[in-house]
Structure formats: C-alpha cells, structure tokens
Regions:
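Outer-membrane beta-barrel transmembrane domain signature of Gram-negative proteins
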Residues: 214-216
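Membrane-proximal interfacial segments on either side of biological membranes
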Residues: 3, 21-29, 74-196, 202-209, ...
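Terminal hydrophobic membrane-targeting helix
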Residues: 12-83
C-alpha cells in the first residue's frame, strides 16, 4: 500500500522548465557550427520506475524551418529509458536548412542539382530491472527521394527512391535489419532503368545485395549476390538480361544506326575498379529469342562492314553485306563482346535470316568481327566513372 501511495504521489506532473544553461549552450553551439539557429524547450516531472525517478521531454526546433527533433526520457536508480523522434519532414534543395548545409559542404563535381523527398527518424533505448544491459533500436525512413543533376555535360536523374534502414542491438552488439530499396526510375550515362528494387543486407563490415531487378530496354535486368567490402570496392558482377527490346539495346552499340525489332536475352559482366570509382565492362553476350523472327534495318551499315577489308573482303563482298543489313528479317541474332588485353576488345555479330533486295529474297548467314578499343565499341560513355571522379576521360 505504501508503494502504491508513493506511485500515485509521484505520477508524472510535467511542468515546463528552462533548459539548463549548459545543455542549452551545447545545443545552440552545435547548431551554430552548421550555420543554424536552434530553439530548445524542456519539461520535467516525476515518475515511478521501480523506484522514484525523474521523467521529461526535450524538443529542439530549427528556427524558421519545419525541422524538429523531440526526445522523451525517464530514469530512476533502477532503470532508465529514452526515445528520440523526428516526424516526417519534407525537404528540397531550396529548404533553408538544406541550403545552409550545402553551402558548408558543397558538391563541386556536379551542377544544376535539384532534389526533394521526405525523411523521418525514430530511436529508443532502455535498461530495466529485468534487462540490466541497454537494449536499443533505430529506424530512418526515406520516402520519394528524387534528384537530377548535370555532370560533365551529361544529365543524371533518380526518381522515387524509398528505403527504411533500421538497426537494433544489445549494448554494443549491432543487428542491421535487411533493407528493401525501391526506385521508380534511374537515368545515368545514357541508360534508363524503371522500377528498380533491391534486397540488401548490411553488416558492420560488408554489404550484400542478395537480389536486384529493374526494367531495361523494354525487358528486365537482374543481379544476384553482389558482395561489397566498403574498404575495398574492387569486385565483379554479372547482369542478366531477359526479353529486352533489340532496337533499344542496339542503340548502345557504336556504329549502329537504323531500326531493329525482336527480343534479346543474355548477360553482361562488369567490374568495379579503383576502389569503386570506375565501372568497367568486361564481356557481354546477347542472343535473340529462338524460333522468333525479328527485323534489322541499318541506315548506315558501313561502320560495321569497314572492318571486313582488313579480313580480305573485296569491295563487292562488302557491298553485298551492306545491302543485306539494310533490309533483313533475322531468325538468329547474336552479339558477343570479348575483352582482350588492355583496352582492346572484339565485337562479334552473327546474323542468320533473309535479306530483301527489291522483289528478291536472299538467304543470309553472316558473322562480323569488329576489333577496337572497348569504349569505342560500346557506348557506355563511362559517365558513372566521370561523375565519381569529377573529371572527363
């Protein structure tokens, strides 16, 4: 009965109080380091936490902005708890707080940077009579983040990124919750991805992308089991392509101009090098859907046929190949890119089908091998590398 009476007497009576000068000065000085003005408010009261204790709340608002952080806490001689929350807050590059931070930490490698989205934060920790070590959890929620920028004259854009990183632990042991990342669209270095999503597992020492998928060239691109060591980002991975549009895919091959129809499948091997600062294409293999007929109409086949002169083809033979590629119905289309020594590579194109010359149909069984530097054969633009390095190659 005595304990109950004490509990009733010590039930929280929250009263606004002045923030202690030491705490207020610390909050204001930390905000001032970022060029911001903070307005702290506090309330205190009493509570019963396996014994008499103190409870209260602290709220810090950034002046002339929607940014707000609030904390609730309670403690006694036996146990304590604390919770921090930042309500969902919309932001953009024109937000006063964001603008101040960008002025302090400018992004020099890009221009025309615009972005928007919303973010929320929650965290809590406690130590009770039954759990003598602190138990904690934290969650950051990012919604509908979109950004666009220019890097070395090339546009990059990301729209609709949503992800919720979360972690929990006991004392200093950390368990990071698996994340599911979604992005509505990505445009970078001439490549467009739609409906990107990825499952990611993060530990204190590594990142594992268990699966990722996106719409690409009217089809699908998939990635499986990409392991990243943050201290050494040199790694390789394979992209699997399924049911992509042949016409869209061939626009990324230098020398291709014209129209194509049909669906392609295959895989592309890529490497992260120089600590993740550059992406290098290794090998690639694409093939048409077996049993289906596609169309190939090259408006300028000369870039693909000029290399035949080095293989001993005379002008008439090269002209016949060029004529065939201007109006071709193919049953087999294969592209095989093989990286050689240094920057050299070979692009092998195999086409089987029927070419139309006026009213005459001619069977075609052709393999073209084009040698050159890899970046000349495939129009990757190395834009991702240039963005990270901040320079043009």
């Amino acid at each position: 009965m005595i304990g109950l009476a004490v509990a009733v007497l010590l039930v929280i009576i929250a009263l606004p109080v002045a923030v202690p000068p030491i705490a207020e000065n610390l909050i204001r000085s930390k905000a001032a380091e970022f060029g911001l003005s903070a307005v702290p408010q506090m309330s205190l009261g009493y509570c019963w936490r396996n014994g008499p204790g103190i409870a209260g709340s602290l709220q810090v608002k950034i002046k002339d902005s929607p940014w707000l952080v609030a904390a609730d806490f309670g403690a006694s001689c036996s146990e304590w708890s604390a919770a921090v929350r930042m309500p969902e807050t919309a932001f953009s590059e024109s937000d006063p707080v964001v603008r101040t931070l960008l002025a302090k930490y400018p992004v020099t490698a890009v221009s025309n940077l615009t972005f928007s989205g919303s973010v929320a934060l929650s965290a809590k920790a406690e130590r009770t009579f039954h759990t003598p070590v602190p138990v904690w959890s934290a969650k950051l929620q990012v919604k509908d983040f979109s950004a666009s920028l220019m890097a070395k004259g090339k546009p990059y854009a990301l729209a609709g990124l949503s992800v919720t990183p979360a972690a929990r632990g006991i004392a200093d042991r950390v368990d990071i919750t698996p994340m599911f990342l979604r992005v509505k669209s990505i445009s970078a270095a001439g490549f467009d991805l739609e409906g990107f999503h990825a499952s990611v597992r993060v530990s204190e020492k590594s990142v594992l992308v268990t699966e990722a998928s996106a719409g690409f060239c009217g089809g699908q691109v998939n990635l499986y089991s990409l392991f990243l060591d943050p201290k050494n980002l040199n790694t390789g991975f394979t992209l699997f392509l399924d049911d992509i549009n042949a016409g869209e895919a061939l626009t990324h091959v230098n020398g291709f101009s014209g129209e194509a129809s049909g669906r392609l499948h295959g895989k592309i091997k890529l490497f992260l090098r120089e600590g993740g600062e550059s992406v290098r294409l290794s090998d690639a293999f694409l093939y048409s859907t077996p049993g289906e007929v596609g169309k190939l109409r090259l408006s300028n086949p000369e870039p693909l046929t000029d290399n035949l002169a080095l293989a001993g083809f005379d002008d008439d033979a090269r002209a016949n190949v060029a004529n065939a590629l201007t109006d071709l119905d193919y049953s087999v289309l294969r592209l095989n890119l093989r990286r050689g020594e240094g920057k050299s590579a070979t692009l092998s194109t195999t086409v089987r089908g029927t070419a139309t010359r006026g009213e005459v149909s001619v069977p075609v069984d052709l393999t073209l091998n084009v040698n050159g530097e890899l970046e000349q054969l495939v129009n990757t633009s190395l834009g991702y590398s240039n963005l990270l390095k901040g320079k043009q190659k």
